[in-house]
Swiss-Prot record:
GO terms for molecular function: 1-deoxy-D-xylulose-5-phosphate reductoisomerase activity; manganese ion binding; NADPH binding. Pfam families: DXP_redisom_C (PF08436), DXP_reductoisom (PF02670), DXPR_C (PF13288). It catalyses: 2-C-methyl-D-erythritol 4-phosphate + NADP(+) = 1-deoxy-D-xylulose 5-phosphate + NADPH + H(+). Its cofactor is Mg(2+); Mn(2+). HAMAP family: DXP_reductoisom. The keyword NADP applies. NADPH binds at T11, G12, S13, I14, Q39, N117, E119, G199. Keywords: Isoprene biosynthesis, Manganese, Metal-binding, NADP, Oxidoreductase. This is 1-deoxy-D-xylulose 5-phosphate reductoisomerase. Belongs to the DXR family. It comes from Thermomicrobium roseum (strain ATCC 27502 / DSM 5159 / P-2). It is an enzyme of class 1 (oxidoreductase). 1-deoxy-D-xylulose 5-phosphate binds at K118, S144, E145, S170, H193, S206, N211, K212, E215. Its EC number is 1.1.1.267.
Length: 385
């Protein structure tokens, strides 16, 4: 039987690679819904090839581009695609906070979710966990590090036997650049990630290491891991993706070439493993593997994200929203690379968190507030430049 796949964020980097995996296994999967916010030409080509039953787009006026397919639009369209009746697996590959509501809707509908949207867990982790406990939905992480950790945690063990959980980070393109030169970094330089092929937002987050900080928060909620057991190491080769250290001194590692098709395929096929077009790992050809502690002076976003994760409430939402605005401003040449994290911290310092318990409405309100404040701070930076 072929499983129906609903793919949200189909024209982005993860979305395109998901369709590569699906296309390689036409006997196992069929695309029943596609959703995208932009790149309509690319979406039209995807619709022509995969012939989904439903297409969700940002603007209703663009529906004329798909005359032979049922079209829905706006945030409600994303939710409809995420809960589509014939979808067995919902792949959430949206970038940013737009992924939160459809992820929660898919979970409430009891769908199996292949999740590549960090914000759904970082901002709404408590809500997602609560819905999972009620519906029994399965969330399969697509991020390479969390996929690796998910696989490691399936090894026989008792929770008390875990001493440390370690996520790796490449260190991005500036891990060796002199600190005094970081304020001269250009957007093109920051977008040149040494190992991964990703979209622009996550590539900049990888350069600041905020991405890894968000992954610490994500690991906390996905796997119920306390922050004091979560660590990060710099691993420039991006071959080892996660490590599990046990109390007896043993450490097990997950290693693979840095290719997103591997975690995508694992999430789609789980618990089955099938042959991949990615070559098997050849450690002899790779040569030395290096590991270093992160330099928090170079990467202040990492301890900031940990601090935010521990604080909880709507602080993670403010972190993510302010980061989106700061990254947009950097890519537009409005602020320096070294101003990204200070701008985010300034927004966090102004935030008054929502009262408990956390709600979707509080998350969305905090998101709007943080974006407004971040834009105001960007405007001030431009005026004083």
């Amino acid at each position: 039987m072929r499983l129906g796949v609903s793919l949200l964020g189909s024209t982005g980097s993860i979305g395109r690679q998901t369709l590569e995996v699906v296309a390689a296994h036409p006997d196992r999967f069929r695309v029943v819904a596609l959703a995208a916010r932009s790149q309509i030409d690319a979406l039209q080509e995807q619709v022509r090839i995969f012939r989904p039953e439903l297409v969700a787009i940002a603007q209703e006026s663009l529906g004329i581009s798909f005359p032979d397919t049922r079209v829905v639009s706006g945030p409600g369209g994303l939710v409809e695609a995420a809960t589509y009746e014939t979808a067995d697996i919902v792949v959430i590959a949206l970038s940013g906070n737009s992924g939160i509501e459809p992820t929660l809707a898919a979970a409430a509908a009891g769908k199996t979710i292949a999740l590549a949207n960090k914000e759904s867990v970082v901002c709404a982790g408590p809500l997602l966990r609560d819905i999972q406990s009620r519906t029994g939905c399965q969330v399969r992480p697509v991020d390479s590090e969390h996929s690796a950790l998910w696989q490691l945690l399936q090894l026989p063990h008792r929770p008390a036997e875990i001493a440390r959980v370690i996520l790796t980070a490449s260190g991005g393109p500036f891990r060796d650049r002199p600190l005094e030169h970081l304020n001269q970094v250009t957007p093109d330089e920051a977008l040149a990630h040494p190992t991964w092929r990703m979209g622009p937002k996550i590539t900049i987050d990888s350069a600041t290491l905020l991405n890894k900080g968000l992954e610490l928060i994500e690991a906390h909620w996905l796997f119920d891991l306390p922050f004091e057991r979560l660590d990060v190491v710099i691993h420039p080769q991006s071959i080892v993706h996660a490590l599990l250290a046990f109390v007896d001194g043993t450490t097990v590692a997950h290693a693979a070439y840095p290719d997103m098709r591997l975690p995508i395929q694992y999430a789609l096929f789980y618990p089955e493993r099938v042959a991949s077009t990615v070559p098997p790992l050849d450690l002899a050809r790779i040569g030395p593997l290096e590991f270093f502690p992160p330099d928090t002076e170079r990467f202040p976003a990492l301890p900031l994200a940990r601090e935010v994760g521990i604080a909880g409430s709507t602080y993670p939402t403010v972190l993510c929203a302010a980061d989106e605005i700061a990254v947009e401003a950097f890519l537009a040449g409005q602020i320096r690379f070294t101003e990204i994290v200070p701008l985010i911290r300034s927004v966090l310092d102004r935030h008054q968190p929502a009262s408990e318990p956390l709600t979707l409405e509080a998350i969305l309100a905090a998101d709007r507030w943080a974006r407004s404040v971040a834009r105001e701070l960007v405007g001030r930076a431009i005026r004083h430049a």
